[in-house]
Regions:
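Short, mixed-charge low-complexity intrinsically disordered segments
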Residues: 15, 33-53
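Short aromatic-glycine-(Arg/Gly/Cys) micro-motifs in beta-strand/loop hairpins
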Residues: 1-16
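A short, exposed loop/beta-hairpin motif centered on an aromatic-Gly-Thr core
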Residues: 13-27
Length: 53
């Protein structure tokens, strides 16, 4: 399991990040969308998915 940082801009152009533990980047995105209401409403607003080593 790896740690991923995911980032996005909201409608006010404010940048946000969340950290997720997952087996791969696809699973990290799924977890982030489950955890963040904005990403549920705007699922394709993610612009950064980075594995933290």
């Amino acid at each position: 399991m790896s740690h991923y940082t995911l980032g996005w801009h909201d409608q006010l152009n404010e940048y946000h990040e969340i950290g997720e533990y997952a087996t791969d980047a696809f699973e990290a995105v799924i977890h982030a969308r489950e955890d963040v209401p904005y990403l549920q409403a705007h699922p394709f607003s993610l612009e950064k998915i980075e594995e933290v080593k």
